[in-house]
């Protein structure tokens, strides 16, 4: 195992075990399969997020910036470039799904080879 989850990238760090730590999700760290991209998020925001609530919708790391701006009540701000993210506050408040119909895509220029972490091409 690597120091921060998933199987280590270097073959001499590995103990030969396949990706099973994310079962039943397919694959793990470094993969675009669900086991490599799906991470839990725990939120506590008294008066806004209902205790014990659960949301299965997705969001991206880019969504945190506009969400934090909205949480802080900042409506007018200048940026050097357009903001890529979408505020996920409607998901927290259970008032809507800003990700509905949103396409996700990744560029993975470095594919794993036959000695990769439990994956053979």
Protein language model features and the residues they cover:
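Ligand-binding/active-site lining segments
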Residues: 35
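Active-site glycine-centered loops adjacent to acidic/histidine catalytic or metal-binding residues
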Residues: 3
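C-terminal cap/loop subdomain of S1 sulfatases and analogous C-terminal strand-loop tails that border
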Residues: 6-12, 16-32, 49-53, 57, ...
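Catalytic cores of eukaryotic secretory-pathway lumenal/extracellular enzymes that build
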Residues: 38-39
